[in-house]
């Protein structure tokens, strides 16, 4: 997605060989026009999948998930990382290790909002090692719902999360795939395009 790649190049900051800071438009300050375009792109890619619900994780996945849900005409449910006083019982639970924060979080979804009749699109801001996506998949599977695919805003293709998910037969659609963050520079995966005659 060209507009996203340009935003990453212009406003993203490479902090190390595996950390990209995008707090100027995605995971702290949010660019609503960009989020709207991201939502439209996810909706376009998954429009034939009969999605009934979008599942994401708090908090950075919420904005792109809501915009995609708006385009698809479905609801969003986000996995919580902390227990809520109003949501104590009747929860699906999974553990997710965060390499960025170096901690394990117990994530949860209410059983009241997802069930076996749902066809789910999982959306998240980043895909690196795949832990968040695997945790969200576990919650959806516990509910007996089917997974249509995973939509990722930015995939760190140099890490193994995307490969692991695809090897499991999961459809993963990433809007920006980063090949490397070496020397303080973002390099995107180049996809060959077929020439139309």
From Swiss-Prot:
Which keywords appear in this protein's UniProt record, sorted alphabetically?
A: Cytoplasm, Glycosyltransferase, Purine salvage, Transferase
GO MF, one term, reads: xanthine phosphoribosyltransferase activity
According to UniProt, this protein's pathway is: Purine metabolism; XMP biosynthesis via salvage pathway; XMP from xanthine: step 1/1
For the protein in the UniProt heading, the enzyme class is transferase
Instruction: Say if the entry is tagged with keyword Cytoplasm.
Output: yes
One GO cellular component, as annotated: cytoplasm
Catalytic activity reads:
XMP + diphosphate = xanthine + 5-phospho-alpha-D-ribose 1-diphosphate
User: What are the binding positions for 5-phospho-alpha-D-ribose 1-diphosphate in this chain?
Assistant: 128-132
Subcellular location as annotated: Cytoplasm
Assign the protein's first listed, main location to one coarse class: cytoplasm
Binding locations of xanthine: 20, 27, 156
Q: Which InterPro entries match?
A: PRibTrfase_dom (IPR000836), PRTase-like (IPR029057), Pur/Pyrimidine_PRTase (IPR050118), Xanthine_PRibTrfase (IPR010079)
**CDD domains from the UniProt entry:** PRTases_typeI (cd06223)
On assembly, the entry states: Homodimer.
Family per similarity comment: Belongs to the purine/pyrimidine phosphoribosyltransferase family. Xpt subfamily.
The entry's protein name is: Xanthine phosphoribosyltransferase
């Amino acid at each position: 997605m060209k507009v996203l790649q340009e935003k990453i190049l212009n406003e993203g900051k490479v902090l190390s060989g595996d950390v990209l800071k995008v707090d100027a438009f995605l995971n702290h300050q949010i660019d609503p026009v960009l989020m709207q375009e991201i939502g439209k792109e996810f909706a376009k890619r998954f429009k034939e999948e009969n999605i009934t619900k979008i599942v994401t994780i708090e908090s950075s996945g919420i904005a792109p998930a809501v915009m995609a849900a708006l385009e698809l005409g479905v609801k969003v449910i986000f996995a919580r990382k902390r227990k809520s006083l109003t949501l104590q019982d009747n929860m699906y639970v999974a553990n997710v290790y965060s390499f960025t924060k170096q901690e394990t979080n117990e994530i949860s979804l209410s059983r009241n909002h997802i069930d076996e009749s749902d066809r789910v699109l999982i959306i998240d801001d980043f895909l690196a090692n795949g832990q968040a996506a695997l945790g969200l998949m576990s919650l959806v599977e516990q509910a007996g719902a089917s997974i249509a695919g995973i939509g990722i805003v930015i995939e760190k293709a140099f890490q193994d999360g995307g490969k692991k998910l695809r090897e499991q037969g999961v459809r993963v659609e990433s809007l920006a795939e980063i090949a490397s963050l070496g020397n303080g520079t973002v390099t995107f995966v180049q996809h060959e395009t077929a020439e139309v005659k």
